[in-house]
Curated annotation (Swiss-Prot):
Pfam families: Cadherin, Cadherin_2, Cadherin_C_2. PANTHER family: CADHERIN-87A, PROTOCADHERIN BETA-2. One of its GO terms (cellular component) is plasma membrane. It is found in: Cell membrane. Residues 31-692 are extracellular. One of its GO terms (molecular function) is calcium ion binding. The gene is PCDHB2. The keyword Transmembrane helix applies. It comes from Pan troglodytes (Chimpanzee). Glycans are attached at residues 171, 420, 438, 569. This is Protocadherin beta-2.
Amino acid sequence: MEAGEGKEPVPKQRQVLIFFVLLGIAQASCQPRHYSVAEETESGSFVANLLKDLGLEIGELAVRGARVVSKGKKMHLQFDRQTGDLLLNEKLDREELCGPTEPCVLPFQVLLENPLQFFQAELRIRDINDHSPVFLDKEILLKIPESITPGTTFLIERAQDLDVGTNSLQNYTISPNFHFHLNLQDSLDGIILPQLVLNRALDREEQPEIRLTLTALDGGSPPRSGTALVRIEVVDINDNVPEFAKLLYEVQIPEDSPVGSQVAIVSARDLDIGTNGEISYAFSQASEDIRKTFRLSAKSGELLLRQKLDFESIQTYTVNIQATDGGGLSGTCVVFVQVMDLNDNPPELTMSTLINQIPENLQDTLIAVFSVSDPDSGDNGRMVCSIQDDLPFFLKPSVENFYTLVISTALDRETRSEYNITITVTDFGTPRLKTEHNITVLVSDVNDNAPAFTQTSYTLFVRENNSPALHIGSVSATDRDSGTNAQVTYSLLPPQDPHLPLASLVSINADNGHLFALQSLDYEALQAFEFRVGAADRGSPALSSEALVRVLVLDANDNSPFVLYPLQNGSAPCTELVPRAAEPGYLVTKVVAVDGDSGQNAWLSYQLLKATEPGLFGVWAHNGEVRTARLLSERDAAKHRLVVLVKDNGEPPRSATATLHVLLVDGFSQPYLPLPEAAPAQAQADLLTVYLVVALASVSSLFLFSVLLFVAVRLCRRSRAASVGRCSVPEGPFPGHLVDVSGTGTLSQSYQYEVCLTGGSGTNEFKFLKPIIPNFVAQGAERVSEANPSFRKSFEFS
């Protein structure tokens, strides 16, 4: 994109920037302020205080980045932001900077930012009398024929003084003599030319040579002077002066002409003969620059280059050439040499302001201010600036070849953190020359990215009975920012369930996101829980994100089967009555057991471990029902003791035993026959009856209370279903010898017992129903129930 050529419509968002740029241009276009200083003033000397002219207070100078800029790479001035003083950066030599030009003015600008303003000013360098008049030739030779009549004027070599104004050359004097006096003539360009005027005729025989001292004086205070010896040789008569073919020669020569190139050939002729007709050529009134640049052949009049030309330094030369014959007569001509400019200078770029580091997300922000220049002329000095097209920057022309580099669209460090910008300045010469200036802009980070977790949710598995401080898993989040904006800190967020004691369950390492269990977990108390973790960066303001963590507690076989019926609490043993007329398969009783574990650890199997008479009774492995294995006979003992083993399917398996007492009776309507070891007293029979009734009533009441409590707990849990996790239970058919007691044990069936008890005066018969325990429906492969602290040892199974 090229600045200075066709411009696209300015977007609305840049109106503010353009306003300040135009404001700066408007101010820059005002009449410049003038300041002056004498040349050769010491570096650091005070020039002027700019506060009043700038219309600023001292405190605003640093804020607005006030600085002095000027064309070229050399900075002659410096600006003190603390005081507003304009100071010299170095000694200034007026003759070196401006030569004979008067006045000697150095333009400069004061650049202000925020908003951008240019303050135009000029520094005039006053001349001091630091140069004396100097004659380039310390001896001036004049050959004057003795026939010259009085009143004849002779032009002599003038002195040169680099100072200007009153300090320049003002007067000449000649030493006292009888033959000549000095006449001063002003030329058209204001130069004083000394001339010798003959007062009386010369006589070579009387005085063949006259020596005079010519003194040049300047107008300084005190004046300076320079002298030269004027040696006059009186020669014989020569009545024809050399005449040039042209009084003015105009030539053009390219500035890249090689040394030794011919510039021009001048030619003069003399009508005299002999030595009076022999012509020699020499420079007349030639400055030091002319003598350094050109060489003149005394015999041929050929003007040659002595050194390379430079259009940017000197564009024209006026060379005075004098032709002198052997008799001392001379004539002059002028060779006007015009140096032709070539495109031999590439453009120059001077950076005034450069901001190397820019925060991201900024737009229409000033990056750099620079100026361009080309010492060539015409199209060779016209320039255009450009940068790469694929960058979010654009160039804005300002005033007097000043440009600003501005951000066009907001930068994003995460997309690109560094830009290498090449500013190309190209002139319109042939061939086109260009200069490239590279700058690097670093995009600094702004906290515009929140940490992002690698997963939106994490599922962690922990086996119960773990050791405290166990590492159970990790969460991880990354931040696309850099530095402190990318440093992530992890934390636990308050749980949604106010009853979940999260602070006592888990902790998180704030630096790396490692999660630790603070206590030993109990599956039977808490199967699963979930919580949220936060990740926050250290930016300002800090950004954060969160993720869900689900912790599933895996069951361990840490609970042995618990026999609910018959009670094994050490009280009076439970006695089951079986009629001797019972058929094989007759249901004697049912051993009811539960296991606090889940899944395979809660699958229970039953087997008959001991029996008074093996083969008479059997236990169904899958439901714990005790049934008769064959017909009973009179030979079978009336009292039997059975030991039933209840075993789970864990690894290693855990077990419990239940002891049953079975009493064989002939019929429920007949009197009760005491066991052999029982006392025949009627009081003992009555006591046994009371024990049986109390035991059965207690078991029934216990089951009823358990069912009611379980239903209440389930209803309470459903009200908190939003925070309930999921847990898997074994699927597929159970093994044939196992029964699933998850939530129900073996109490899923209702059954009856008929009991015949002998009273004191007759036979009483009654029946009662066992309480029905409802089936607990499995919650699915992913459902996990929350722990209820008040129901830890109750019928809570998954």
